Amino acid sequence: MKIIKVTVVYALPKIQYICQVDIALGSTVKDAILESNLLNLTNDVSFHHNRIGIYNKTVHLKFKIKDGDRIEIYRNLTIDPKEWRRNNIFLSKKLKKIY
């Protein structure tokens, strides 16, 4: 059985979890995440609430991984993007008035 190396990544604002995993060829994304033990390191990660991707492309948990893949676990948005832009515009206008 051939062994491949993949990286499982989950990033928070102040800390990053990066786990190198040696796993059998033909394994799935879910297998690699379980092997990384990332689910036990933080309570923020869940198969039901987080999207998963490989190199910024969303994939399903049953997707077969290849040697060298970087499996990324994405965080949920904490603020609506439209609301964030509104707040930024408001702050930038406020700062312009000061100067």
Swiss-Prot record:
The gene is rnfH. This is Protein RnfH. InterPro entries: Mopterin_synth/thiamin_S_b, RnfH, RnfH_sf. Belongs to the UPF0125 (RnfH) family. Gene3D superfamilies: RnfH-like. PANTHER family: UPF0125 PROTEIN RATB. It holds the Pfam family Ub-RnfH.
